[in-house]
Amino acid sequence: MIKKNKKVIIAMSGGVDSSVSAWFLKNENYQVEGLFMKNWEEDDEKEYCNAAKDLSDAEEVCKKLNIHLHKVNFSKEYWEKVFENFLNEHKKGKTPNPDILCNKEIKFKIFFNYAIQELQSDYIATGHYAQIKKKNGKYFLLKAVDLNKDQSYFLYTLKGIQLKNILFPIGGLKKSQVRIIAKKIGLKVAEKKDSTGICFIGPKKINNFLNRYIKAEKGDIITTEGTIVGKHNGLFCYTLGQRKGLGIGGIKGNYNIPWYVIEKNIINNTLIIAQGSCNKRLMSIGLIAEKINWINDDKIIFPFSCQAKIRYRQIDIFCNIKYINDFLIKVLFDSPVSSVTPGQSIVFYSSKICLGGGVIQSRLPLL
């Protein structure tokens, strides 16, 4: 099928995935143009942000592939739609996932609309590891072939109506295959490391970054028995299930069993810890989720059973979903689950199909 009249704007990040995606689209006879999004003003964040290097890499790839590269600054929109939420949720003691919100508000809303309306594109494309399939006139989001790299977890806020204008060119490939292709076509980014950490922070320590924006109030670290064993540096620095960086070495207990964060008490500004990753105080029988999105609303009939992930790259867990109201659902796990973290997202699956998801409002503790 000749697609030379179909225009695609691909989000170029300067990485190997978007670069190979652009190459695939060119080979499939699309009219391809790239777009580099500047979502963060890095003038004061040189320690954290790699945007300048990423832009340089994107420019070099586009030059080699002979495609035009648009450069757009969405940093104001990112601050208002993503970063302010990120800070507010941390202040509430939750652990948000800004990359999911970035996909929803920036990549698949602001960028999507800019490409379709301003640049008159037929499609947008990204280097995400996910797949889109059409069946009986409807579009479905599926896991990638490379389950280790599958990014459908980050894409659950999409709607079926959007999917018809979105392309994920490498969703059917393994990451190793993508790198091999990049080498064969002579892309210098073939061996570029995958981005790590939150997009605007990079691999640096998040707590150092957050200290620039949130006033840290130190407080007590206490055991479930009420014993004070140390001081925390601000509740936003910790997440449920965390074991490293607690600074409580040498306290009494079974020295062979590590300590974990099991609760953050905002009212008393205390961090509560217990020993063992399967400690009953860390386990949950379910959760309450908010900000729900179903990719294909008409396919959802309550109650129903499916699989779910409460964090990226987690093995799917079986659960039952019950309707509470138009804004909340109750999720009950088949077996207790450790480290359910308010602020993170739970994403639902029926085998390989991503049904949608929501933000974890609260957990239903085992004890």
Swiss-Prot record:
GO cellular component, one term: cytoplasm
Keyword Protein biosynthesis annotated: no
Region (Interaction with target base in tRNA): 97-99
Protein name: tRNA-specific 2-thiouridylase MnmA
Role description: Catalyzes the 2-thiolation of uridine at the wobble position (U34) of tRNA(Lys), tRNA(Glu) and tRNA(Gln), leading to the formation of s(2)U34, the first step of tRNA-mnm(5)s(2)U34 synthesis. Sulfur is provided by IscS, via a sulfur-relay system. Binds ATP and its substrate tRNAs.
Positions annotated as active site in the UniProt record: 102 (nucleophile), 199 (cysteine persulfide intermediate)
Keywords per UniProt: ATP-binding, Cytoplasm, Disulfide bond, Nucleotide-binding, RNA-binding, Transferase, tRNA processing, tRNA-binding
Site keyed Interaction with tRNA: positions: 128, 344
GO biological process: tRNA wobble position uridine thiolation
Name of the top EC class for this enzyme: transferase
Catalytic activity entry: S-sulfanyl-L-cysteinyl-[protein] + uridine(34) in tRNA + AH2 + ATP = 2-thiouridine(34) in tRNA + L-cysteinyl-[protein] + A + AMP + diphosphate + H(+)
Region of interest (Interaction with tRNA), residue spans: 149-151, 311-312
InterPro entries with a match to the protein in the record: MnmA-like (IPR004506), MnmA-like_C (IPR046885), MnmA-like_central (IPR046884), MnmA-like_central_sf (IPR023382), Rossmann-like_a/b/a_fold (IPR014729)
Disulphide bridges, residue numbers: 102-199
GO molecular-function terms, A-Z: ATP binding; tRNA binding; tRNA-uridine 2-sulfurtransferase activity
Cell location: Cytoplasm
Predominant location category: cytoplasm
Subunit: Interacts with TusE.
